[in-house]
Amino acid sequence: MSLQMPIPRKKALTVSHFSITLSLFLAFFISSTSASTNEVSALISWLHSSNSPPPSVFSGWNPSDSDPCQWPYITCSSSDNKLVTEINVVSVQLALPFPPNISSFTSLQKLVISNTNLTGAISSEIGDCSELIVIDLSSNSLVGEIPSSLGKLKNLQELCLNSNGLTGKIPPELGDCVSLKNLEIFDNYLSENLPLELGKISTLESIRAGGNSELSGKIPEEIGNCRNLKVLGLAATKISGSLPVSLGQLSKLQSLSVYSTMLSGEIPKELGNCSELINLFLYDNDLSGTLPKELGKLQNLEKMLLWQNNLHGPIPEEIGFMKSLNAIDLSMNYFSGTIPKSFGNLSNLQELMLSSNNITGSIPSILSNCTKLVQFQIDANQISGLIPPEIGLLKELNIFLGWQNKLEGNIPDELAGCQNLQALDLSQNYLTGSLPAGLFQLRNLTKLLLISNAISGVIPLEIGNCTSLVRLRLVNNRITGEIPKGIGFLQNLSFLDLSENNLSGPVPLEISNCRQLQMLNLSNNTLQGYLPLSLSSLTKLQVLDVSSNDLTGKIPDSLGHLISLNRLILSKNSFNGEIPSSLGHCTNLQLLDLSSNNISGTIPEELFDIQDLDIALNLSWNSLDGFIPERISALNRLSVLDISHNMLSGDLSALSGLENLVSLNISHNRFSGYLPDSKVFRQLIGAEMEGNNGLCSKGFRSCFVSNSSQLTTQRGVHSHRLRIAIGLLISVTAVLAVLGVLAVIRAKQMIRDDNDSETGENLWTWQFTPFQKLNFTVEHVLKCLVEGNVIGKGCSGIVYKAEMPNREVIAVKKLWPVTVPNLNEKTKSSGVRDSFSAEVKTLGSIRHKNIVRFLGCCWNKNTRLLMYDYMSNGSLGSLLHERSGVCSLGWEVRYKIILGAAQGLAYLHHDCVPPIVHRDIKANNILIGPDFEPYIGDFGLAKLVDDGDFARSSNTIAGSYGYIAPEYGYSMKITEKSDVYSYGVVVLEVLTGKQPIDPTIPDGLHIVDWVKKIRDIQVIDQGLQARPESEVEEMMQTLGVALLCINPIPEDRPTMKDVAAMLSEICQEREESMKVDGCSGSCNNGRERGKDDSTSSVMQQTAKYLRSSSTSFSASSLLYSSSSSATSNVRPNLK
């Protein structure tokens, strides 16, 4: 018998408690293990959600692990549950979509997947991760909208979604993130308004929403409730309206960055209450009114950038009390009054930029207290008086731009104290006195421009010490003495222009040591002696101009070694001897002018080996003799030939092959024989042929005689002929009466027949005038005028593509029918005013590499045909807007087209006599050749400037819709400046990829108004924005030139010659600036989005120096507005 002992009650309770505890532990363990397993599964699933294998750095992610806590980039909680609290992946190229099962991570506090090429949309499930404190998904390729479910995250402190492709609005639900401190959503494609609900987040310290070009509306007044806000960045958006007064409540605000937007109204004086403000960036807006003096209370402000607004009035003295300021930029406004003397209190000031205002008075000497000043730019104002010698105390000064003012007196010797000076431009002032020798002791000086002053004295011998010089321009002064031999020490000099002075003595041999020289202009001085043989060592020289001096001796044979030379101008000197045959080796020569010398001998045949000689060959006013060599016909591209006032003899048959000649002068020689029966000779006037007694035209025994005996003989012949003429007159009158009756009958017949035939081929003989050597006939052309060959229609006619029997393809423009007189000499002289006569008159007289080649014309009663070279790539308009591959039109090609078109238009305006106004510049009238070279075409509305009715109203609208200059609407006047405006519109079209009136431009704005409002890199064609920084810089500088061209005031627009010069120097200036800055701040090859970066704002700065048509700005302002490292420091991209 067994006895069962009873269990005590206390022990039974203990066993029961243990059992419950064990059950709970097991349940928790199983639950925790299950959660960890789910997280492992979720991470592995995400890692393999792409077809590409995951990066090797994720090899430690083992799907067999029970939890991911030991995996790279993963952090778990310290408790026993081992749940993921952090996912931190930065700068690893994942190329994965956003984690689809993000809600699996219930304890996640920090989600950082930045700069990993994360794709897809942000899942709304992210709002279920209620523990999240930090979300950083910046610098990826995310698309779609920002999930409104983020508003559920009450613990969220940082939300960084910047630099993605997010669209849609900023969700108002973000206002429910009551713990949010940093909101960074800049550089996306967000739109609509900034939610006023953000004003509910009292913890907010940073709002950065810039770079969203469609973000619009006003800055909400409620932002003033975010009392902890330190950064407000809304740059490069469409934010409009006024700055809210409530911003003055933000006492902790450190950076206000709302540049390149559509802000208007006045700067609120309440900003003076933001006592912690460090950066105030409001440039490139439409702000108006005066600068509030209350800003003077901002003792912590370091940078105040307000350039390119409409601010006016005096600059308050109180600004000088902001002792922390290191950068002030008030350029491109309408400030008046003087430079405040209180600026002398700004001991930390590094940059003071006041360019392009209406500032008067003198430069305060007290600015010398600003000992840290690096840039001082006061150009394009009305500043007068002396340059204070105290400026020389600024030891850190790099750049001093004071051009286009009213400065007077001497350049102070004390400027030599600016030991770090790199660029000094004081052009277009009233400076006198001599050049300070100390300037040439500055070992960092690269550019010295003193154009158009009244500087006298000699060039100091110390010039040889300034070995850093790249550009030296002393044009149009009163400098005397000799050119110092020490100039030969300037090994970096590429541009030397000493023209229009009173220099004397020889051209120094030592100048040949400047091996980098590309341009040497010593013209319009009184230099004597020989031209140095050693100039041949300047193998990079492109322009050599020593005209209008007193140089003697022979032209050196060694000039033939200058293989890069394209312009050689030796005119108006006393050179003797023969023309060296070695010049034939200068194969790049386009212009050769040896006129007005004492050159003798024959014309060397070797000159005719220069195939590029297409602008001019001028050998006039010399003592050349002999025959014209037959080989001269090889210069088939030559436009101007002047061999007048020599002793040349023989016949002129050799000249008949020069089919492209526009101007020919053979007067005052000893030519004989008949004039060739070619176009250029038929167009010569008497003054261009006179003085050749033996020269005759076919059908006459003598044509150009001028001695008295021959004139007496002519009088006798004339008397005899007069008697015969009277006898014939009676007979002819009777015949004409009969013919008159027949003509009336015939006219009625023709009118009736004309209604049945557009061409009237059977009624009127076709007239054919070729301007080139053509291998086809009118009949060949007419056969091609069928509907299937039409390639375009315009306001002046239809354009056909025509293939000739010899497989040559040409373009034929058939002008719209209009009955006009036959274009015989009589009607030409009377000035027919239709598109045919205008275009023939214009195109037949010009030659330029960027103007479409006019082959010839043919016409009859009412059909008029113009023939051109056919352009295989069509027009610029079709390239930009009608082809799917527009993005493949790279910057190099676009720049080439812009520059070439400018050069062609400059030729029309400045090199044609008389000047020619195109009147219809547009993208469709710029044709594109096989190598993407541009050609200006369609002169259907062209008028010559000296036409009597040129400036009066025209019955035909001059120009095309979208391109017409604004002054035409009220004055109906067309000038060269009208062409400049139209060209500016074309440049905007090329840069933006948009048409002048484009449906994609918001609010129906014209491209000009749109660009002026945006004025940022955002206007650049999307296909170009990813180009290297150096190219983007060139685009923005080109945009600055375009803004000059579209100035609403015609007088303030540059000439096309200046435009072409500016564009030509953009690349060159950038290269030189890299030398100046040591590649500081401008040699980066890329842009890391989201970091402080100066690219776009530096480009904005370029525009402000493009406001003057001064020739000096192209040599300095373009460079120093865009490449200075100091400038870069004050253009942060705080979006």
UniProtKB/Swiss-Prot annotation:
<feature type="short sequence motif" description="Small peptide recognition">
    <location>
        <begin position="351"/>
        <end position="353"/>
    </location>
</feature>
<keyword id="KW-0808">Transferase</keyword>
<feature type="repeat" description="LRR 13">
    <location>
        <begin position="419"/>
        <end position="442"/>
    </location>
</feature>
<feature type="glycosylation site" description="N-linked (GlcNAc...) asparagine">
    <location>
        <position position="465"/>
    </location>
</feature>
<feature type="short sequence motif" description="Small peptide recognition">
    <location>
        <begin position="447"/>
        <end position="451"/>
    </location>
</feature>
<dbReference type="GO" id="GO:0004674">
    <property type="term" value="F:protein serine/threonine kinase activity"/>
</dbReference>
<feature type="short sequence motif" description="Small peptide recognition">
    <location>
        <begin position="281"/>
        <end position="283"/>
    </location>
</feature>
<feature type="short sequence motif" description="Small peptide recognition">
    <location>
        <begin position="399"/>
        <end position="403"/>
    </location>
</feature>
<feature type="repeat" description="LRR 19">
    <location>
        <begin position="564"/>
        <end position="586"/>
    </location>
</feature>
<feature type="binding site">
    <location>
        <position position="813"/>
    </location>
    <ligand>
        <name>ATP</name>
    </ligand>
</feature>
<comment type="similarity">
    <text>Belongs to the protein kinase superfamily. Ser/Thr protein kinase family.</text>
</comment>
<keyword id="KW-0472">Membrane</keyword>
<feature type="site" description="Essential for autophosphorylation activity">
    <location>
        <position position="813"/>
    </location>
</feature>
<dbReference type="InterPro" id="IPR050647">
    <property type="entry name" value="Plant_LRR-RLKs"/>
</dbReference>
<feature type="disulfide bond">
    <location>
        <begin position="69"/>
        <end position="76"/>
    </location>
</feature>
<dbReference type="GO" id="GO:0010449">
    <property type="term" value="P:root meristem growth"/>
</dbReference>
<dbReference type="InterPro" id="IPR011009">
    <property type="entry name" value="Kinase-like_dom_sf"/>
</dbReference>
<feature type="transmembrane region" description="Helical">
    <location>
        <begin position="724"/>
        <end position="744"/>
    </location>
</feature>
<keyword id="KW-0325">Glycoprotein</keyword>
<dbReference type="Pfam" id="PF13855">
    <property type="entry name" value="LRR_8"/>
</dbReference>
<feature type="compositionally biased region" description="Low complexity">
    <location>
        <begin position="1108"/>
        <end position="1128"/>
    </location>
</feature>
<keyword id="KW-1015">Disulfide bond</keyword>
<feature type="repeat" description="LRR 22">
    <location>
        <begin position="635"/>
        <end position="658"/>
    </location>
</feature>
<keyword id="KW-0832">Ubl conjugation</keyword>
<feature type="modified residue" description="Phosphotyrosine">
    <location>
        <position position="970"/>
    </location>
</feature>
<dbReference type="InterPro" id="IPR000719">
    <property type="entry name" value="Prot_kinase_dom"/>
</dbReference>
<feature type="binding site">
    <location>
        <begin position="791"/>
        <end position="799"/>
    </location>
    <ligand>
        <name>ATP</name>
    </ligand>
</feature>
<feature type="glycosylation site" description="N-linked (GlcNAc...) asparagine">
    <location>
        <position position="492"/>
    </location>
</feature>
<feature type="repeat" description="LRR 18">
    <location>
        <begin position="539"/>
        <end position="562"/>
    </location>
</feature>
<dbReference type="GO" id="GO:0010082">
    <property type="term" value="P:regulation of root meristem growth"/>
</dbReference>
<keyword id="KW-0812">Transmembrane</keyword>
<dbReference type="GO" id="GO:2000280">
    <property type="term" value="P:regulation of root development"/>
</dbReference>
<feature type="glycosylation site" description="N-linked (GlcNAc...) asparagine">
    <location>
        <position position="345"/>
    </location>
</feature>
<feature type="topological domain" description="Extracellular">
    <location>
        <begin position="36"/>
        <end position="723"/>
    </location>
</feature>
<feature type="repeat" description="LRR 21">
    <location>
        <begin position="612"/>
        <end position="634"/>
    </location>
</feature>
<keyword id="KW-1133">Transmembrane helix</keyword>
<dbReference type="GO" id="GO:0106310">
    <property type="term" value="F:protein serine kinase activity"/>
</dbReference>
<feature type="repeat" description="LRR 6">
    <location>
        <begin position="251"/>
        <end position="274"/>
    </location>
</feature>
<feature type="topological domain" description="Cytoplasmic">
    <location>
        <begin position="745"/>
        <end position="1135"/>
    </location>
</feature>
<dbReference type="InterPro" id="IPR013210">
    <property type="entry name" value="LRR_N_plant-typ"/>
</dbReference>
<feature type="glycosylation site" description="N-linked (GlcNAc...) asparagine">
    <location>
        <position position="273"/>
    </location>
</feature>
<feature type="repeat" description="LRR 7">
    <location>
        <begin position="276"/>
        <end position="298"/>
    </location>
</feature>
